[in-house]
Amino acid sequence: MNNYSNLALSKSKGRIFKEANSLYRTPFQRDRDRIIHSASFRRLKHKTQVFVNTEGDHFRTRITHSIEVAQISRLIAIHLCLNDDLAETLSLAHDLGHTPFGHAGEDALNECMVNFGGFDHNLQTLRIVMFLEHKYLKFKGLNLTLETLDGLLKHNGAIDDLSTVNRLIGLKSFKNKINFTNSGSLEAQISAISDDIAYNNHDIQDGIRAKMFNLNDLIEINFFKDIYKSHKNNIKNNNKDILIYQIIRDSIDLMVRDLIKNTKNNLKTNKVKSLQDVYKLEKPIVCFSSKFLKIEKEVRFFLRSKMDNNKKVLLKNNHGKKIVTKLFYKIKKKPKQFLNADHLKNDPNRAIADFISGMTDRYAINLNKIF
C-alpha cells in the first residue's frame, strides 16, 4: 500500500473564530461531531433522496445516503493514508443544504429566488454551518475548521464564480482565510466522488425495490451483466434479493478499486509531491479511469431513463415543486408569523429561503395543508 500521508491535510490552520484545542479529539474529529450533533443533520432523516420517506421504510433518505458516502470516503482515504476524519466529515456534511423533496424542491426554491440571488444547495450547506446553526454563545454557526469549509465550498470542484459565493455567503465572512483559487484537497475530491459512487449504486437498489425496473433491465449494462454472471450459479434458489445485494456490493468494490488505482496513477503521472502540487492542478486527481468513466455514464443514463423520467417520480417531483413554491409566497406575505425579526432584517427573501430549505418533507407537507 502506497503512503501518501505527505499529501494529507493532517493539521488544521484553525477556524474563523479562535478556539482552544480539545484534549481528546483532533480538530477534524470535532468538526465531524459538531455535524452529527447538529439539528440540520438530524433533519436529513426526513428529507428525500429519490423517494419521499412516507413511501417506505427501507428507501434511502439524505441521512442514510450521507452515512454511506462517509463510509466509502473513509475506506478510500485510509487506503491512501490521507485524513480519513476530514473525508468523513465532508461526506457527512455535504447534503445539509438540501431542500425538502430533493432536487425538485431545490429547483422550485431557486426559481422563487431568481431575482434575489438564487438558491444552491451546496452553498446552503455553507450557510448552515457558518450562520444558521445556533449552539454557541461566542459565534453563529458551528465554526468548523478552514479545511472543512474549503472542502465543502469545493465539493463540485474549484470555484469558477466568486460572485455567487459572495451573494449567498459573503466573501468577508471567510476573513481572508480561504484560498478560493486553489483546487480542492484530496480529501474533498474523495468525498465528492464517493457521493457519486454511493448514489449511483444505491439508487439502483431503491429503484428495483420500487419496481421501476428489474434485474433483467439492469444487466443490459455489460458491467452489471458480468457481475451477475459471476454469481448467478452460486445463489441458492436463484434468490434475487441476495443477488441484487451482491451485485451492488461488487459494483461498489470494483469502482473503489478502479478509483484508488487511477488516483495513484494520476499522482505519479502529474508528479504530485506536495499539497501545493495538489492545489495547482486544475483537473481532479481523484477520479475514475476512462473505462469506469464510461461505465458511470452508462449507469447515470440508465437511472435517468428508468427513474428520473418515471411517471410516478415526475408526479412526486411536480407536487414537491408546487408545495415549495406555494410555501415561499405564502410565507412572504406574513414573514413575521414564521421568522424572528433578527433573521428578517438583513434579507427577508434569503431568510425565507433558509427557513424552507431547512424543512423536512413532512414539515413542508403539513405546513402546506394549513395554507
How should each PLM-predicted stretch be described?
Residues 80, 84-106, 125, 195, ...:
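His-Asp-centered metal-binding catalytic motifs of divalent-metal-dependent phosphohydrolases/nucleases
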Residues 56-64, 93-100, 113-116:
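Short coil/turn segments at secondary-structure boundaries
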Residues 92-93, 110, 344:
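Conserved short loop/turn motifs at secondary-structure junctions
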Residues 89, 100-117, 208-216:
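Post-HEXXH active-site segment of zinc metalloproteases
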Residues 73, 80, 91, 97-100, ...:
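Generic hydrophobic/packing signal
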Residues 1-66, 70-76, 84, 118-123, ...:
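Histidine-centered, transition-metal-coordinating active-site segments
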Residues 76-77, 109:
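Broad structural signal for hydrophobic residues in well-ordered alpha-helices, predominantly aliphatic
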